Each structure stands twice: as structure tokens, then as C-alpha cells.
Amino acid sequence: VKDVFKKQQIPYTSYFTTPTPLNNWLWYVVAATDSGYHIGYRSLFDKERKIDFHFIHRNDSLLKPVTDHADLQKLLRFSKGYYTVQQQNDTLVFNDIRFGQMIGWKDAGAPFVFYYYLQHPSQNDFVIQRGRFARWDMDALRVLVRRIRGE
């Protein structure tokens, strides 16, 4: 993966890789920068040593209104620095990106599996990977299998 970062001129301060659901052939790759993350997927069967990355901003500035929020401090520690923040209607959503995206190999804009509502904590009754298999259907499974094959 480091060779791919170098070849594709992807800057990073840290990175991690983890397998996607149900297999060990397609890997979720995240390269952190000071302002966000380059995210991509790499199959062991890819013919080219290339990863199609997309960039997601961390959006730290959105946290200013809730910096003293006790849950936020716990989430920052828990995420080990791998998070994004986004505004959804009237609330801020904290995404721990280490757990991946719901069918991210099919849709680069897919939601993250672990997310937490910062301004509506009562909606966080069950937050651990609440969306791991959300949005899965036969098409998502077909795309996963094709992507594993290196297509």
C-alpha cells in the first residue's frame, strides 16, 4: 500500500487497511492527512497496482459548538483520530471511519457504519456498527464479488 501511495502521490500522516465484510480479498484502505482522508479499496486480485481514492474532509471546524460535549471527548479518544464530522439537517454526525462504509466499494459517498448524533444523543441507543449491512441487496453483493475479482 505504501508503494501505491508513493506512485499515486497520495500524501499521508498515517494509514490503515482492513478487510471488507465477509472476505479477506477486498481491503478498505484509509490514508490520513491533516485535513481528511483518502479512502479506497484494493483487491488481492487487482491486475494494476493502483487504488482509486476519493477524499473526505474531516470537518473539524464543525465541532466548535460542541467542543465541551462529554460524549465528543470520548468519541475523539475512541476513534483514535480517524473520524469525520458532517452536518445532517439540524444535527452534527460524528463518523468513526475505522469501521468502513456501508457498501463503500459500490458507492464512494455511502454512509459510515459507526456514526453518532452529537446534538441528539437520545437517538444513539445502539450505535455500534448499526449500519454494517444497511443498503445491502443482490446488486451490492454482485458489485462486491466483481470488485473482489479485481474488476
Question: What is each stretch, according to the model?
Answer:
Residues 1-13:
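Alpha-helical transmembrane signal-anchor/signal-peptide segments
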Residues 13-14, 21-151:
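Extracytosolic and intramembrane catalytic regions of membrane-associated proteins
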